[in-house]
């Protein structure tokens, strides 16, 4: 009886693991291992994001990427650039500027941990996006919860139609 239970449990684990692997490979599920947003498993939705939502964003959605060295782009197992997970901090009509304290201000309200850095943690130079900017109807401003996040501070506004809303399923 015990062996039968072990076999059944093993089959359940294999089945659930296979389903999760298929969903991750199909890019419906996102496994986040960075500190930009909470680490864990996220679900990608085909829904237009709004301010306060998290999004999955490809690098080509941003307006200022020509200066970025290739080593900034992590790749998946198929060699494709991995998209980022970021928080929508600003949207159509919002004004984004740099405050006196160095933090990004969105409509005059400071965003925590948002001061652009001159260098990353590896000592490589970073180029802050030129502010102020008022976001157009097709743009969103994406930030990270981490002071070291690589986001709109350096890459500019992102095209909203290239972004997918992402919701956390299991984070830690």
PLM features: what roles do these ranges have?
Residues 57, 98, 142-143:
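A generic structural signal for residues embedded in beta-strands
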Residues 53-55, 94, 139:
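Structural motif
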Residues 50-51, 91, 99, 135-136:
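Residue-level recognition of short, solvent-exposed, well-ordered loop/turn junctions
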Residues 79-113:
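Mid-length scaffold segments of soluble, non-membrane domains
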Residues 103-172:
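Beta-strand-rich cores of mature extracytoplasmic or soluble domains
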Residues 1-83, 132-134, 153-172:
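Protein maturation boundaries and topogenic segments
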Residues 28, 91-96, 129-130:
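Short small/polar-residue motifs
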Residues 60, 93-95, 146:
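Short loop segments at secondary-structure junctions
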């Amino acid at each position: 009886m015990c062996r039968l239970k072990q076999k059944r449990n093993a089959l359940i684990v294999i089945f659930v693991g296979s389903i999760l692997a298929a969903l991750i490979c199909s890019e419906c599920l996102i496994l986040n291992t960075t500190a930009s947003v909470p680490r864990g498993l996220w679900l990608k939705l085909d829904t237009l994001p709004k301010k306060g939502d998290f999004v999955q964003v490809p690098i080509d959605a941003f307006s200022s990427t020509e200066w970025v060295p290739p080593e900034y782009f992590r790749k998946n197992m198929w060699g494709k650039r991995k998209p980022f997970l970021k928080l929508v901090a600003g949207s159509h009509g919002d004004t984004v500027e740099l405050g006196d304290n160095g933090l990004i201000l969105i409509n005059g309200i400071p965003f925590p941990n948002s001061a652009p850095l001159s260098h990353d943690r590896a000592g490589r130079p970073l180029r802050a996006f030129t502010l102020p900017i008022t976001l157009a109807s097709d743009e969103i401003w994406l930030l990270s919860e981490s002071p070291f996040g690589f986001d709109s501070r350096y890459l500019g506004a992102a095209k909203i139609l290239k972004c997918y809303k992402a919701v956390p399923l299991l984070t830690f």
